Amino acid sequence: MSLVIAVYGKGGIGKSTTSANISAALALKGAKVLQIGCDPKHDSTFPITGKLQKTVIEALEEVDFHHEELSPEDVIESGFAGIDGLEAGGPPAGSGCGGYVVGESVTLLQEMGLYDKYDVILFDVLGDVVCGGFSAPLNYADYAIIIATNDFDSIFAANRLCMAIQQKSVRYKVKLAGIVANRVDYTTGGGTNMLDQFAEKVGTRLLAKVPYHEMIRKSRFAGKTLFAMEEAQTEFPECLAPYNEIADALMQEHPIASVPVPIGDRELFKLVNGWQ
């Protein structure tokens, strides 16, 4: 059975870039990885495959939504380091429900028996609204990871995600492996001062600290993981280190994880004054 990881974070937080680099680090350490993009934007696997691949919803449309007519080859593309990628996709803007599409994709994976074919399955999930469909990966995940930056809006979203994880943990095995601090800037962004306090408050840890670095942005535009960028390998190893740390933590026999204890919304707003 695969190790199933669900990566969440608010839109624009760098969640997909982080997910792709975690997948790359895991693959380079010997794991067979499937990364699943669960966002209507369907660009999660772009750094792995170098293209916007066909989505599950597009493939289903071609067979008039008869699941049984699809095979893994219809929806999976292989890319960097042998990583396989799948994109759930979503309905046209202004119509349908993106969460429903994610839920359908999770069901399709089960029907195809893919949960037994990989060492690691990593879901990259939109985390602004954790409704039924978008929370579906938590039903299968061993561990959740939250991507956040050192600002209130990001922490507010992270707290809502902690609520979802706590609720799911009542019926499912999922636990929170930690928070990845992204775009860490000690010059103007306060480092991780707010995230450190939040993590302690909800009973988790900072799994890694990813620096705010031009090299990471360049890799995204190039359609590559950092591990595929020679410049990153030779000149900016500090950009690669956090993803290797995360991979090492996840590949332990018993990764450190916990059920978070979220803060009430009003309490969180009150705490902000102490973080200024």
Curated annotation (Swiss-Prot):
PANTHER family: LIGHT-INDEPENDENT PROTOCHLOROPHYLLIDE REDUCTASE IRON-SULFUR ATP-BINDING PROTEIN
UniProt keywords, alphabetically: 4Fe-4S, ATP-binding, Bacteriochlorophyll biosynthesis, Chlorophyll biosynthesis, Iron, Iron-sulfur, Magnesium, Metal-binding, Nucleotide-binding, Oxidoreductase, Photosynthesis
Pfam families per record: Fer4_NifH
Residues that, per the record, bind ATP: G12, I13, G14, K15, S16, T17, K41, N182, R183
Reactions this protein catalyses: chlorophyllide a + oxidized 2[4Fe-4S]-[ferredoxin] + 2 ADP + 2 phosphate = protochlorophyllide a + reduced 2[4Fe-4S]-[ferredoxin] + 2 ATP + 2 H2O
Family matches, as InterPro entries: NifH/chlL_CS, NifH/frxC, P-loop_NTPase, Protochlorophyllide_ATP-bd
Record text on cofactor binding: Binds 1 [4Fe-4S] cluster per dimer.
Protein name: Light-independent protochlorophyllide reductase iron-sulfur ATP-binding protein
Keyword Oxidoreductase: yes
Reported cofactor(s): [4Fe-4S] cluster
Disulphide connectivity of cysteines: none
GO function term, MF aspect, one: ATP binding
Subunit composition and interactions: Homodimer. Protochlorophyllide reductase is composed of three subunits; BchL, BchN and BchB.
Similarity section: Belongs to the NifH/BchL/ChlL family.
PROSITE patterns registered for this protein in UniProt: NIFH_FRXC_1, NIFH_FRXC_2, NIFH_FRXC_3
Annotated gene: bchL
Binding positions (Mg(2+)): S16
Gene Ontology biological process: light-independent bacteriochlorophyll biosynthetic process; photosynthesis, dark reaction
